[in-house]
């Protein structure tokens, strides 16, 4: 049981780390845009914000599935992932339409697409987290009162670190 718990925790941890990496990518891309003296249009920012808000919702749902052990949440997360993909496709098409109308800069197309792609990958990681709930992985709470003294010392030492 402990080995399964450890493996599940590693999967969740790995996916959270990947989400953090994608956040760094988004931050780096946006800084690159600003460093080049360019700005995203208000419409582009609104589209990206909608995608990021949905991704944030997905992350919350995924973590809730792990915390509660709700095995139905992964299906909800997968449905929301489809909504994110639809938002991202719409955002990409809207960007190209703005480029045609000269309300967005063509040179930002690659960076804008990369921003959308990073959010898509975050959503994939959220699904992987939620799927751990299907495997009955949940964060067990430690019962400190019933632990032996060595375990209690380790828990207290960890809490002080």
Where in the sequence are the language-model features?
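Cytosolic, long alpha-helical scaffolding segments
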Residues: 1-161
């Amino acid at each position: 049981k402990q080995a399964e718990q450890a493996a599940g925790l590693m999967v969740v941890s790995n996916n959270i780390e990947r989400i953090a990496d994608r956040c760094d990518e988004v931050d780096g891309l946006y800084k690159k845009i600003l460093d080049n003296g360019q700005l995203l249009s208000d419409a582009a920012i609104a589209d990206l914000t909608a995608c990021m808000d949905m991704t944030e919702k997905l992350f919350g749902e995924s973590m809730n599935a792990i915390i509660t052990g709700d095995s139905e949440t992964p299906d909800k997360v997968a449905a929301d992932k489809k909504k994110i993909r639809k938002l991202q496709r719409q955002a990409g098409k809207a960007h190209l339409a703005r480029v045609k109308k000269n309300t967005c800069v063509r040179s930002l197309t690659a960076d804008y697409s990369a921003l959308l792609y990073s959010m898509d990958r975050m959503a994939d990681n959220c699904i992987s987290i939620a799927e751990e709930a299907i495997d009955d992985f949940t964060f067990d709470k430690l019962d400190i009162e019933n632990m032996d003294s060595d375990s209690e010392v380790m828990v207290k030492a960890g809490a002080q670190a």
